[in-house]
Amino acid sequence: MFTETLRKYPILPFLDRKCCIDYDLPAPTGTGKIKLPVGTGVYIPVLGIHYDPKYFPQPEKFDPDRFTEENKRSRPNYTYIPFGEGPRMCIGKDRHLNFPIRILGYSN
């Protein structure tokens, strides 16, 4: 339930990064390339990815079953990134994922 909530309402609608190597992206038209030199700022549209029906069918619908093990395996990596990924991901990720356990522990 928490994962689906963060899919629909991520903490940040985008992540910003800088290219650390020169990179060529395929052009949206299918011909040519877009060059991204070292130091270029890049925005990763988290909200756009989380609402892309290619990865999350009926993205407006609240459906916690999207995150069953079977459904998670059927999606490409990095299509669910509410905390970012890699060495610059949010340091609060583990705290959030353990939050329900702490709440239940206090209620006993």
Where are these regions (language model features)?
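Conserved cytochrome P450 K-helix E-x-x-R motif and the immediately C-terminal K′/meander segment
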Residues: 1-32
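Conserved cytochrome P450 K-helix/beta-meander segment immediately N-terminal to the heme-binding cysteine loop
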Residues: 9, 44-71
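Active-site-adjacent bridging/hinge elements
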Residues: 16, 70-81
